[in-house]
């Protein structure tokens, strides 16, 4: 049996969600999906469970007067990949702690630009708090993609879309379907369900693109702050925890899973080493951007996550306990 599924059987549900082409955002998790471990609403967002155990209705929250709710913006960690059920995502845990609605605006594999656009497209009321729980994907996607734009960033599936448009195979009849097939293949390789003969290759050195990554981050946070100020909402940035960035004693489960994933797809190990090399500069630069923009910055790569407890199902995504600790960290930092 797949060791990942043996130790974390809920991952099967996440791998089955799928994705669809979405205007402006390129792609998004499929809507109206219902599995034992994860469900999505009509917008493709994961359902948040309130403190009474009920699903929070996004439309109802947006239609009510006042701003007594929060939004968590990010990618797969906010989505809650790895959690055993909807109750254990960060937004659900915050809803339990605060007894107020926290909406899950996490979409898997998004960069900071997509996160900002995602909020712009779906925000229809004034939240009290906007939390950005992010940081890993801008760096990761720059490593995986052929190039990084100081305007458009690097996005998941970019190389496949670029190849499709530039290919002789491109035509009005097949371009979109072919692109989606390639993006799906890339996603399956990412989660380890299929292999790529080039997996062990180091895609590129991002030194030349590093400033572009930071430019996109600063632009996106600037835009998010403008949105927050316009709605009289607080905005806070939390650097998400990454096993590679922590001085963590790995649990036996983490050791098994990381070794299994590295053997299954050698590029995981290469990526982990790459992210580790940029750790100190990246933390400092993102914090400096937040200080420049007047956005509170917190880093979860701290002693909170350095115990030998099982906190990660892979180097990015967490267990129920990992997400609970993240929610408590956020609640404590914001004095919720």
Where on the chain are the PLM-derived regions?
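Catalytic cores of nucleotide-enabled group-transfer and carboxylate-activating enzymes in metabolic
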Residues: 90, 94, 107, 132-133, ...
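Loop/turn elements at helix/coil->beta-strand transitions in domains of secreted/extracellular proteins
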Residues: 100-101, 126-130, 231-235, 293-295
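Residue-level recognition of beta-strand->loop/alpha-helix junctions
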Residues: 104-108, 239, 299-301
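N-terminal secretory targeting modules
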Residues: 1-70, 125-126
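Serine-dependent acyl-ester chemistry module
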Residues: 137-284, 308
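Solvent-exposed loop/turn segments at secondary-structure junctions
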Residues: 77-79, 108-112, 136-140, 242-245, ...
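Serine-esterase "nucleophile elbow" of acetyl-processing enzymes
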Residues: 43-108, 113-127, 131, 323
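Histidine-centered active-site loop/cap adjacent to the catalytic His
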Residues: 217, 284-298, 311-336
């Amino acid at each position: 049996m797949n060791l990942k599924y043996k130790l974390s059987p809920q991952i099967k549900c996440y791998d089955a969600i799928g994705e669809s082409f979405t205007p402006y955002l390129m792609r998004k998790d499929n809507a109206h999906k219902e599995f034992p471990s994860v469900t999505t609403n009509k917008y493709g967002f994961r359902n948040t469970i309130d403190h009474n155990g009920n699903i929070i209705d996004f439309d109802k929250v947006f239609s009510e007067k006042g701003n007594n709710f929060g939004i968590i913006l990010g990618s797969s960690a906010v989505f809650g990949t790895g959690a055993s059920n909807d109750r254990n995502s960060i937004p659900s845990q915050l809803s339990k702690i605060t007894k107020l609605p926290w909406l899950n605006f996490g979409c898997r594999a998004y960069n900071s630009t997509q996160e900002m656009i995602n909020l712009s497209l779906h925000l229809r009321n004034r939240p009290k708090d906007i939390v950005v729980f992010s940081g890993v994907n801008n760096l990761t996607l720059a490593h995986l993609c052929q190039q990084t734009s100081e305007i458009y960033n690097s996005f998941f599936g970019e190389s496949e879309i670029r190849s499709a448009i530039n290919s002789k195979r491109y035509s009005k009849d097949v371009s979109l379907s072919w692109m989606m097939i390639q993006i799906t293949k890339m996603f399956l390789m990412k989660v380890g369900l299929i292999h790529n003969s080039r997996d062990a290759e180091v895609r590129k050195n991002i030194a030349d693109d590093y400033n572009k990554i930071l430019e996109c981050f600063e632009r996106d946070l600037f835009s998010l702050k403008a949105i927050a100020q316009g709605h009289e909402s607080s905005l806070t940035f939390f650097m998400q925890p990454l096993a590679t960035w922590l001085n963590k004693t790995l649990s036996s489960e983490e050791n098994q899973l990381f070794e299994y994933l590295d053997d299954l797809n050698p590029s995981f190990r290469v990526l982990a080493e790459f992210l580790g090399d940029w750790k100190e500069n990246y933390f400092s630069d993102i914090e400096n951007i937040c200080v420049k923009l007047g956005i509170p910055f917190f880093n979860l790569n701290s002693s909170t996550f350095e115990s030998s407890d099982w906190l990660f199902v892979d180097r990015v995504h967490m267990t129920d306990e990992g997400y609970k600790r993240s929610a408590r960290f956020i609640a404590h930092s914001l004095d919720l």
